Amino acid sequence: MSRNEVKEGRLADFIQRSVATAIERDLKDPALRSLTITEARVSPDFHIAYVFWISQNRDEAAKALERAKGKLRSRVAKGCGLRTAPTLEFRYDELQDRAVRIEERIQEALRQDEEMEKQSSEKGFAGEENPYR
């Protein structure tokens, strides 16, 4: 791992913690109460930080994040140790939704398997005994 990759990782961790803490403690917007910061990534040139989030009220939270973007960037700038703080780009974390959909599909497939097993166990062979013995 190169020195830059290590720095990117540390900066991303710092940004994730700073943004999450600022949302929890400093911002009073009710739309951000159910918001969770799931991850942060930093571009190789440290100019852009992609902050991934999830929330129950997606549209309201997205608007609230846009309104708070300047305050959050100021909070990051205070402790990041860079000449200029990275621009924060907020992106909804689709991974969580995909995981939920996959889990639902797995549960549905298991239910169908159980139904088929139940139906096949209730049915017998056409004759008195198993012809395949």
Language-model features and meaning:
Residues M1-I48, I54-R133:
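Charge-rich, low-complexity N-terminal segments
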